[in-house]
Regions:
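Conserved Lys-Pro-Asp/Glu-containing loop-to-beta segment of HAD-superfamily phosphomonoesterases
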Residues: 130-153, 288-293
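Substrate-recognition element of Asp-dependent hydrolases with the DxDx(T/V) motif
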Residues: 60-111, 120-124, 239-246
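Acidic, Mg2+-coordinating phosphoryl-transfer loop and its flanking beta/alpha structural elements
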Residues: 146, 151-179, 313-314
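A metal-dependent, Asp-based hydrolase signature
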Residues: 23-71
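Long, charge-dense
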Residues: 257-282
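Structural motif
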Residues: 6-7, 99, 147-148, 243-246, ...
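Active-site neighborhood of HAD-like aspartate-dependent phosphohydrolases
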Residues: 1-36
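Long, contiguous domain-sized segments
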Residues: 214-217, 273-426
């Protein structure tokens, strides 16, 4: 039988490694020191903490009860499995956690991340930290204890003569720390969540692909979505249409962050440069009041479409190589064409290029021209991580998006980059 620490060993928080970020999510920055002081003054129980919140603040019982409900809802919503450890848990194992949550609360969180119901749960305020638990007969029933805390999960059990394994991968990476240092703790938390949810065996191609998307594409998509939202707030379009194929992941992240309706514009360089009658009819139906959002480009195809048809589209690129004409600006001007190519490749879709649309506006596609395996891994990692983002990033600038795009260029699989076709670069 193995005993397991729970927080940051089996379950992660979307808000990040520091649990007080949940307090900020619930009540704002000013609430954090109140909540922390209440915990210090309390009897170290969940109910006792909120009794102290009311004592400190003088707030009404109804207001404090709402904060309590909101904090628990945030904990549940932000819980994710640390995959490489959860897959090791067996039905007869035991969870031992120093926490202010009750055993029933930890059970609810454990259920959410897929822990078997037959796993026993033991909770206390500091029995592991103080060493009291490790002196018990129950602790000696375990062949091994696994946890992330240097003292509680490593030093204390070993001092009691028990086998222990310290889990260190839950600590933030240097990239995650850099985003948090720049004020984007919600981005760092989402990237960390994606990284720790990696379901693939270490050393496999799938693990590498997932890891790259978690580290680089999750921050890029979150920051890009925030920049698009700011632009759209100023432009005030009736709707946003994200351009197929490379912007489909961005559309999903945008919707997850802002809960605003989005649509997909099924188009390609081919359809814009040589539009059929059906494609023209499709564009005319879609264009009024629509802002078209493309992930990366030079604007050549859009300008050629306007020249040939006289139809001017309200078009914006997230990333470009230079300042474009007023009808097709780029929100972030990249420092090199290779970075833009990498962004496209990391955000490939697993359906073929649009060659035309039918009379109903349904896409007609060419066969898929690249390996779908890494594409599908990138998609799942990117969406799973981005959906766990606690709140939309704030204060995003073009430079932040450029920095994130440059990280994508370093992380994109070289085997997929080699498959990038010439027609994708126009």
């Amino acid at each position: 039988m193995t005993s397991w620490d729970f927080f940051d060993t089996l379950m992660g928080r979307a808000a990040g490694h520091e649990p007080w970020r949940v307090f900020e999510t619930v009540g704002g920055a000013a609430y954090v020191p109140i909540r922390q002081e209440a915990e210090r003054r309390s009897d170290r129980t969940w109910d006792g903490i909120f009794d102290q919140v009311r004592e400190i603040t003088g707030w009404t019982a109804a207001r404090v009860e709402q904060l309590k409900r909101d904090e628990w809802a945030a904990e549940v919503a932000g819980a994710f499995p640390i995959a490489e450890n959860v897959t090791r848990v067996r039905p007869g194992d035991r969870i031992v956690s120093d926490t202010y949550f009750s055993t029933l609360q930890v059970r609810e969180l454990a259920d959410r991340i897929g822990i078997p119901k037959t796993v026993q749960i033991v909770t206390s305020w500091d029995a592991k930290w103080s060493g009291q638990w490790w002196k018990s007969e129950a602790a000696r029933q375990a062949d091994l204890h696994v946890g992330d805390n240097q003292r509680s999960d490593w030093e204390q059990p070993r001092a009691a003569g028990l086998r222990a394994e310290r889990y260190a991968a839950g600590r933030p990476t240097s990239q995650e720390t850099a985003w948090e240092r720049d004020g984007f703790w919600e981005v760092a938390g989402a990237a960390r969540a994606a990284r720790l949810m990696n379901p693939h065996p270490r050393g496999s191609d799938e693990h590498r692909w997932w890891d790259g998307a978690a580290a680089a594409n999750v921050p890029f998509l979150l920051l890009a979505a925030a920049l698009v939202h700011e632009y759209a707030f100023t432009a005030r379009p009736s709707r946003l249409a994200f351009v197929s194929r490379d912007s489909i992941l961005l559309s999903k992240v945008y919707h997850a962050l802002y809960r605003e309706p989005v649509t997909i514009f099924d188009a390609s360089r081919q359809t814009l440069r040589n539009p059929s009658a059906d494609f023209l009819a499709y564009v005319k139906r879609l264009a009024p009041g629509t802002l078209f959002v493309d992930l990366h480009g030079t604007g050549k195809s859009v300008r050629e479409f306007t020249r040939k048809t006289g139809i001017e589209l309200a078009y914006v690129f997230v990333c470009g190589q230079r300042r474009l004409a007023a009808h097709a600006p780029a929100l972030a001007t990249l420092r090199g064409i290779g970075t833009g190519t990498a962004v496209e490749v990391m955000n490939y879709h697993d359906e073929g290029r649009v060659t035309d649309v039918d009379r109903e506006g349904r896409p007609i596609r060419a066969p898929l021209e690249y390996d779908p395996a890494p594409v599908r891994v990138h998609r799942t990692a990117s969406i799973d991580g981005a959906r766990l983002c606690c709140r939309p990033p704030r204060g995003v600038t073009a430079e932040h998006v450029i920095r994130a795009a440059e990280a994508v260029a370093k992380a994109v699989p070289r085997e997929l980059l080699r498959q990038h076709q010439v027609e994708h670069r126009g």
